[in-house]
């Protein structure tokens, strides 16, 4: 009966016997694409579970730094934490100082927002300006920002409060630093740990 089907369809019996299926797979571009995709996915499934050998990647992150104790900073003290002089990266936003070290790719020396590292980034974030000249070296009271810029700054502050460790506040000239106890942790951070 199989021979009758071959004769009825007009196919050459030698084509079916000599790898007709393989011939069809390798002559159709769509089938080749699907075969390549299957091989790639199989490779990723099998190879993806194996950890990369140490030293293979240039993107190796340095080991995480210990959590910084809460303290307050003057603008001059903050400048040291730019990722170059000190491996830790701190930024001030709206008077609050955040440890953004885990965001080194963004805020580190080579990152797109590296200009803000070790500085009060409030004015730059509020005005969407990445120029170093827009940032002040002394305490910036931000009194000249518009209502829209203040709202933008508040949004940035909320994002940083949610994502990064709040380590203290930025001190005005002549302002005394707050003395924090070792057990003290802000309410927003303890709530974040419960998530």
UniProtKB/Swiss-Prot annotation:
Residue spans, topological domain Cytoplasmic: 44-195
Region spans: Disordered: 51-71, 173-195
Localization: Microsome membrane; Smooth endoplasmic reticulum membrane; Mitochondrion outer membrane; Secreted
Chief localization: membrane
Domain Cytochrome b5 heme-binding: start-end pairs: 72-171
Tissues in which the UniProt entry reports expression: Detected in urine (at protein level). Expressed by endometrial glands and stroma (at protein level). Widely expressed, with highest expression in liver and kidney.
Phosphoserine: residues carrying this PTM: 54, 57, 181
Gene Ontology biological-process annotations: associative learning; axon guidance; heme biosynthetic process; memory; modification of synaptic structure; negative regulation of synapse organization; positive regulation of lipoprotein transport; positive regulation of protein localization to plasma membrane
Keywords: Endoplasmic reticulum, Glycoprotein, Iron, Lipid-binding, Membrane, Metal-binding, Microsome, Mitochondrion, Mitochondrion outer membrane, Phosphoprotein, Proteoglycan, Receptor, Secreted, Steroid-binding, Transmembrane, Transmembrane helix
Membrane topology summary: Single-pass membrane protein
Record-annotated membrane-spanning stretches: 25-43
Lumenal side: 1-24
Subunit architecture: Homodimer. Forms stable homodimer through hydrophobic heme-heme stacking interactions. Interacts with FECH; the interaction results in decreased FECH activity. Interacts with EGFR, CYP1A1 and CYP3A4; the interactions require PGRMC1 homodimerization. Interacts with TMEM97 and LDLR; the interaction increases LDL internalization. Forms a complex with TMEM97 and TSPO; the interaction occurs in MIA PaCa-2 cells but not in MCF7 cells.
Protein name as annotated: Membrane-associated progesterone receptor component 1
Organism (species): Homo sapiens
High-level lineage: Eukaryota, Metazoa, Chordata, Craniata, Vertebrata
């Amino acid at each position: 009966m199989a021979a009758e089907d071959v004769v009825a369809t007009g196919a050459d019996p030698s084509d079916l016997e000599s790898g007709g299926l393989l011939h069809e797979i390798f002559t159709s571009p769509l089938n080749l694409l699907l075969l390549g995709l299957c091989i790639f996915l199989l490779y990723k499934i099998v190879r993806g579970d194996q950890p990369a050998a140490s030293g293979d990647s240039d993107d190796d992150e340095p080991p995480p730094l210990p959590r910084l104790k809460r303290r307050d900073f003057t603008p001059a003290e903050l400048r040291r934490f730019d990722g170059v002089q000190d491996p830790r990266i701190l930024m001030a936003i709206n008077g609050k100082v955040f440890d953004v070290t885990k965001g080194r790719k963004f805020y580190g020396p080579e990152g797109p927002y590296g200009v803000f590292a070790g500085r009060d980034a409030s004015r730059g974030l509020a005005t969407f300006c990445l120029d170093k000249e827009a940032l002040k070296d002394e305490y910036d009271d931000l009194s000249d920002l518009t209502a829209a810029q203040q709202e933008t700054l508040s949004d940035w502050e909320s994002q940083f409060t949610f994502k990064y460790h709040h380590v203290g506040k930025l001190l005005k000239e002549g302002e005394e630093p707050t003395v924090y106890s070792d057990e003290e942790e802000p309410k927003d951070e303890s709530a974040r740990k419960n998530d």
